[in-house]
Amino acid sequence: FEKFGCVIGDECHGFKSKSLTTIMNKCREAEYRFGTTGTLDGTQTHELVLQGLFGKIYNVTTTKKLQDNDTLAKLNINVLLLRYPESVRKEFGKREYHDELDFIVKHEGRNKLIKNLALDLKGNTLVLFQYVEKHGKPLFELIRDGAVKERKIFYVSGQVEASDREVIRQIVETQKNSIIVASLGTFSTGINIRNLHNIIFASPSKSQVRVLQSIGRSLRKSDDGSDATLYDIADDLHWKSRENFTLTHSAERIKIYAKEQFNYDIHEIKL
């Protein structure tokens, strides 16, 4: 790598990985280093690592400024705070994070709500999930089986070839009312869909990079110039002073929305 005099790193927030850090450190003669990203994770450690690899961070603009000058689509966020029954919250107890996620992604009422929401929305909709086997596939089947025959429903995970994902992306850009059920790993970063009107966060996350990158999928201006809408599913399983993990994570996401100056409303829904 010593023969290279210039390095350009796209989506450079990912350059904190060991493999990319190793490559960068071997580019000893690379006097010119350019890294571009729309998202940092908000921690000082992350910023210091990237500064060590590329140099001083320069903030060119913000999402809010790009929305104000009509470069990006306007975004409306609806936080759907799911209130589980008192009996469920009381019996839920103090569980480990993974046990809580298992409970949430397998909850029949929650998945039915996501299905109905996806089917009721107008425009192209992206439903993002985290777990393939226990959430993504069952959710896709629920939505597919509930949709009218003419509506196009797509499923994307790491098991789907990259070439097929690109075909799906191109098809959706020609549609007006399709649904993509996709894993966060495949559709949260680097995928641009011109006519994407809605995003549903079906899985909880507190990662600033993942949240903002996922939102970025919907900010490209659509042909009809309509606003983008994000539906953030939050889960309230707290009991008295005991808060559940995913409720805390939803509070972290709301802090991100406020920091980015996004418009958001919180709606309580009883399951």
For the regions a language model picked out, list residue spans one by one:
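Conserved RecA-like P-loop NTPase helicase motor core
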Residues: 39, 158-259
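Conserved RecA-like helicase motor-core motifs
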Residues: 126, 140, 144-166
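Conserved interdomain hinge at the start of the Helicase C-terminal
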Residues: 89-130, 134-145
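Short, conserved loop/helix-junction motifs that constitute active-site signature segments
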Residues: 1-4, 24-30, 194, 221-225
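Residue-level preference for the first positions of well-ordered beta-strands
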Residues: 6, 124-126, 178-179, 198
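A short beta-strand-to-loop transition that corresponds to the Sensor-1 phosphate-sensing loop
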Residues: 11, 36-40, 130-132, 182-185
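Post-DEXD/H (motif II) to motif III coupling segment of the RecA-like Helicase ATP-binding lobe
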Residues: 5-78, 257
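Charged phosphate-binding loop/patch that engages nucleotide di/tri-phosphates or the phosphate backbone
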Residues: 254-255, 259-271
